[in-house]
Amino acid sequence: MAKISKRATAHGGKFDRSVNHPLSDAIKIIKECATAKFDETIEVAVNLGVDPRHADQMVRGSVSLPKGTGKVVRVLVFAKGEKAEEAKAAGADVVGADDLLEKIQGGWLEFDRVVATPDVMGVVGRLGKILGPRNMMPNPKLGTVTFDVAKVVQEIKAGQVAFRVEKSGIIHAGVGKASFPVEDLVENITALVEQLRRMKPAAAKGTYMKKVSISSTMGPGIKVDQSSI
């Protein structure tokens, strides 16, 4: 934390923390602040006026980022027979069923997203305590429990990002890399925010989207003027 605070302080003179910046300006500042020796991830944090303790205010879903994430996503698919072959052909990194159960229970977690066909959810369900806390449990509402495994694998590989509101009412999502052109990051962030707007729960009261901010892995957070998105 000390390192992040020091970097944030060092970059403090580049922008006014109290101001909501137009999206393109905020991205330019973030890119200037991203001076680490690796290609930092650009993250969006959206504060929502929802109480996720209530099921009718849960915001959870996915969005396909038009310019991708810049990250190599390792996709694991639980499937058998023909569907397993379709998943492999679509680019899945690991495909299996019962054979993967013991491997994952033994601590192997070298994957980022999980997809499953409905007929093997009995196997996958036994991994709930492992996959659930990591937000990797396949879910029909997210489209990750499906027989159309090839389509879903391709979408994930192309830049689909899953999100889920936290207990604090905040959604975090990686939307690209610091090396991305400003225009590409604008497109990706706009796609995410528009998706969240479409998903406003009917039970949500008051202001739905309270604050939008962006940051890089090691940089400070910058507030974004929502009217610019």
UniProtKB/Swiss-Prot annotation:
Q: Does the keyword RNA-binding apply?
A: yes
Its keywords, alphabetically, are: Repressor, Ribonucleoprotein, Ribosomal protein, RNA-binding, rRNA-binding, Translation regulation, tRNA-binding
Q: Which InterPro entries match?
A: Ribosom_uL1_bac-type, Ribosomal_uL1, Ribosomal_uL1-like, Ribosomal_uL1/biogenesis, Ribosomal_uL1_3-a/b-sand, Ribosomal_uL1_CS
Q: Cellular component terms, GO, for this chain's entry?
A: cytosolic large ribosomal subunit
Q: What GO MF annotations does this protein's record show? A: rRNA binding; structural constituent of ribosome; tRNA binding
What GO terms in the biological process aspect are recorded for it? regulation of translation; translation
Task: Tell whether Membrane is among the UniProt keywords.
Answer: no
Q: Which PANTHER family match?
A: 54S RIBOSOMAL PROTEIN L1, MITOCHONDRIAL, LARGE RIBOSOMAL SUBUNIT PROTEIN UL1M
Family statement: Belongs to the universal ribosomal protein uL1 family.
Q: What does this protein do?
A: Binds directly to 23S rRNA. The L1 stalk is quite mobile in the ribosome, and is involved in E site tRNA release. Protein L1 is also a translational repressor protein, it controls the translation of the L11 operon by binding to its mRNA.
Tell me, how does this one assemble? Part of the 50S ribosomal subunit.
What protein is this chain from? Answer: Large ribosomal subunit protein uL1
Taxonomic lineage per UniProt? Answer: Bacteria, Pseudomonadati, Pseudomonadota, Alphaproteobacteria, Magnetococcales
